[in-house]
């Protein structure tokens, strides 16, 4: 009975659900971000082989976030998570200048997939607390984001360990999903 009321209230008050795919190269901070959003604390992580999935509630939206491992050997498995994805969070280690070209190649490969043609793109320029971190403007240029004329995208500087920028990113995603009619 309680569940019936809950579903009724969700319909009346308009709770939305959105499927988000969070990907990026290994060690970019995806799992740390997921659990900082979910639990509000830093958890000890190990490299993700497979995926983690959690629901994160923000502003009456229930984001189902799929955090998929980023090691090169398992990146081909990303495509199995594309179906019904409304938003992509692509996490970049802003301090890893040696692999930014690799990140660009993976992002471009994914954005060319037909199943993701309508998905919004949020880039988290993570690890901004490190002294050698690339700025969001530099990452925008390195990833070629300015050439994405047919896709809504946004880049947000973040620090997964402090939580800086994470909710600002979700705010953009929530507003962009509403504008795009994905609600």
Curated annotation (Swiss-Prot):
GO cellular component: Golgi apparatus
Subcellular location: Golgi apparatus
Entry keyword set: ER-Golgi transport, Golgi apparatus, GTP-binding, Lipoprotein, Myristate, Nucleotide-binding, Protein transport, Transport
One biological process term in Gene Ontology: protein transport
Pfam families named in the record: Arf
Signal peptide positions on this chain: none
InterPro entries reported in the protein's UniProt record: Arf1-5-like (IPR045872), P-loop_NTPase (IPR027417), Small_GTP-bd (IPR005225), Small_GTPase_ARF (IPR024156), Small_GTPase_ARF/SAR (IPR006689)
Function according to Swiss-Prot or TrEMBL: GTP-binding protein involved in protein trafficking; may modulate vesicle budding and uncoating within the Golgi apparatus.
Family in the record: Belongs to the small GTPase superfamily. Arf family.
Name of the protein this chain belongs to: ADP-ribosylation factor
Gene it is expressed from: ARF
